[in-house]
Amino acid sequence: MRRVLRLLLGCFLTELCARMCRAQERSGHGQLAQLGGVLLLTGGNRSGAASGEAGEGVGGSDAPPTRAPTPDSCRGYFDVMGQWDPPFNCSSGDFIFCCGTCGFRFCCTFKKRRLNQSTCTNYDTPLWLNTGKPPARKDDPLHDPTKDKTNLIVYIICGVVAVMVLVGIFTKLGLEKAHRPQREHMSRALADVMRPQGHCNTDHMERDLNIVVHVQHYENMDSRTPINNLHTTQMNNAVPTSPLLQQMGHPHSYPNLGQISNPYEQQPPGKELNKYASLKAVGNSDGDWAVATLKSPKADKVNDDFYAKRRHLAELAVKGNLPLHPVRVEDEPRAFSPEHGPAQQNGQKSRTNKMPPHPLAYNSTANFKTWDPSDQSLRRQAYGNKGKLGIAESGSCDPLGTRTQHFPPTQPYFITNSKTEVTV
């Protein structure tokens, strides 16, 4: 840039010097002409010699030749197509002047069409020629990056969104925690509702078991031979059944509650029936033991005590303390008849108590007889009855022995006013 300025300044000074010289030359010729005219006017009447000398003096002043103008030099520039045109000199003949425009320059002979190159600005590379390069950004003194609030707005929006997300998460956790105790209480309430059913069923089964034991005890007492009975019933080794025993095979005592399944306590369906079948098998296996018991001396002692008590009762009857004509007592119909009991349970036939076809001796007043110790048939029959009674008692002392590990029944003690009291 400095070189260009120096070049322009040199050209300008050269041009200025040339013009000054030309002006001086012109001014010198005018002065000489004026002087010559004055001389001619003032000395018109002089002689020819004097005029000749004056003319020679003037001609001698015009003798030096005029200088030719210096040729111009056109500077290099960028044309309208963006191409660089190198500088050139106008020194060919009369074409000594740089003419044209800033974008197109040439040499000419007319001085009036001369181009003032100092006014042109296409000496540098144009901005549009730098393709792919953004223009240099000028620093704006009014722009302060510290006062720009665009980034701050973005930060504020992101912070608000993050806070809303956190609030939603904590709200959800709080609601779940608030509803969780209610669900726990509901589950506990359901558990409490379902558990008493299991306990009630267990208590009810224990109560049914106690009732069954009591009823069996009463049935055993009813099935025993009375004191004045001459013909006794045949006892079976099987445990007498009762209507309550059929209900014990079901895990639920009530039909409506039996449909509800207990998720906490589930009982196997055939457990009670299997226990009852095993109990019957144990009862069937007691027959051999009863035969061995009858042959023992302890059984003889029991029979002797029995005969002594029978003799004492006969004496009381003779004295009139006991009624000689016993009244027949009608037995209440039982809810469950052993003769029509279940045919099979767990593949075993149930044994029932069969009543003898002939009527009892005490039912008829004509057949009533006092005690005769010499009657061998009565003694033999009483001995058989006592043996069978021992068998029945041994089979019915613990009818549900296998169930006592879960529900131990209490063995009641019945107090009577009879002297033939037997504790079971």
Swiss-Prot record:
Signal peptide from the UniProt entry: 1-23
Membrane topology summary: Single-pass type I membrane protein
Record has Endoplasmic reticulum as a keyword: no
One Pfam family here: Shisa_N
Sequence ranges on the Extracellular membrane side: 24-149
Expressed in which tissues: Brain-specific. Mainly expressed in neurons, including in hippocampus, cerebral cortex, striatum, thalamus, olfactory bulb and cerebellum. Expressed in most brain structures during embryonic and postnatal development.
Family assignment from sequence similarity: Belongs to the shisa family. SHISA9 subfamily.
Protein task: Regulator of short-term neuronal synaptic plasticity in the dentate gyrus. Associates with AMPA receptors (ionotropic glutamate receptors) in synaptic spines and promotes AMPA receptor desensitization at excitatory synapses.
PANTHER family associated with the record: PROTEIN SHISA-9 (PTHR31774:SF1), PROTEIN SHISA-9-RELATED (PTHR31774)
Subunit structure: Component of some AMPA receptors (ionotropic glutamate receptors) complex, at least composed of some AMPA receptor (GRIA1, GRIA2 and/or GRIA3), CACNG2 and SHISA9, as well as low level of DLG4.
Protein name according to UniProt: Protein shisa-9
Upper lineage: Eukaryota, Metazoa, Chordata, Craniata, Vertebrata
